[in-house]
């Protein structure tokens, strides 16, 4: 199954790090969409199917908390899992995001394994090998 993952961060280098991490975790076939702030992300979400969002907190125009609140208000996006990646790792901030509907929170700097493990927990292990039953013959793809 191919996923569509929206990466929202005002830092282009950080978006690149997250994309490389996703590809290394087996999500290389996923459609990886990018936005520099929550407002751009909301526009992308109007025209694209999104399976998961990874967002920063500190961004211009619409920060990550405002963005998560906006997503969770919309019927079409309220069930999309949102993971927050931020330098703000205090318990109060994490609780605030989780109370607004985020399903995960990773503090920067992070290890690639931290993002991979959380995404696998949310979306499941990626396995592109499928077996079709053809009677007495199995076909592996």
Residues covered by each model-derived region:
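Two-component/phosphorelay signaling modules centered on CheY-like receiver
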Residues: 12-33, 100
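Helix N-cap/capping motif at the beta->alpha junctions
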Residues: 34-43, 64
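Short amphipathic alpha-helix used as the core "switch/output" element in two-component signaling
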Residues: 43, 65-78
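Receiver (REC) domain active-site loop signature in two-component systems and cognate sites
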Residues: 59
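Alpha4 helix (beta4-alpha4-beta5 surface) of REC/receiver domains from two-component response regulators
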Residues: 66, 89-104, 117
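C-terminal output helix
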Residues: 110-119
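CheY-like receiver
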Residues: 127-141
């Amino acid at each position: 199954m191919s996923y569509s993952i929206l990466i929202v961060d005002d830092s282009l280098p950080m978006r690149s790090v997250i994309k490389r991490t996703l590809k290394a975790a087996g999500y290389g076939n996923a459609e990886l969409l990018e936005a520099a702030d929550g407002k751009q992300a909301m526009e992308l979400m109007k025209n694209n199917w999104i399976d998961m969002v990874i967002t920063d907190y500190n961004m211009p125009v619409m920060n990550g908390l405002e963005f998560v609140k906006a997503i969770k208000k919309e019927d079409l996006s309220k069930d999309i899992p949102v993971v927050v990646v931020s330098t703000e790792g205090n318990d109060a901030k994490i609780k605030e995001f989780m109370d607004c509907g985020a399903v995960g929170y990773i503090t920067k700097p992070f290890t690639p394994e931290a993002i991979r493990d959380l995404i696998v927990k949310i979306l499941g292990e990626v396995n592109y090998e499928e077996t079709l039953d053809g009677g007495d013959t199995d076909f592996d793809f």
